[in-house]
Amino acid sequence: MEKLNYQDSVEQWGLWEIEIPGPSTGNPFKEQTVKAVITGKNETKEIDGFYDGNGKYKVRFMPSFQGEYQFHVTSSFQETAEGRFRVTEPSKDNHGPVRVAGTWHFAYEDGTPYYSVGTTCYVWELQSDERIRETLDNLKAARFNKIRF
């Protein structure tokens, strides 16, 4: 298998990604497959990859636990590849994914309460790139944590 591009470490609840070079001819979305099995001490996940354009295929994973992980990648176009990466302590502002807390509330994985503060952006797909950037800047300054469009 050609050289894979991946991170040696990622924080808990962060985004780990591996990039696999492959064919870009034909219809790579339908004609090719990529799959990874990722195993840590407390979890094993089988994840389908996707075509990201320009002959690049990717698999993305969010680790739930700290420690050593192994990955095993198979595809329809290359030999099998294996490797390792380490999951470190989450950063101060990374509280993990949002879950149901009790029956009526939400909390991040680490127990920090989650308060949904959001808005709706109508006809988003009809806006100019400039208007989209302006809107995203305004939303960021307003401290929204969700958007519906």
PLM feature spans:
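Solvent-exposed, flexible loop/coil residues
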Residues: 33, 110, 118
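Extended acidic/polar, glycine-enriched regions
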Residues: 37-110, 124-125
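Structural recognition of the beta-strand scaffold that forms the well-ordered cores
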Residues: 114-118, 146-149
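The substrate-binding groove and active-site-proximal loops of carbohydrate-active enzymes
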Residues: 117-129
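Catalytic domains of carbohydrate-active enzymes, especially glycoside hydrolases
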Residues: 131-149
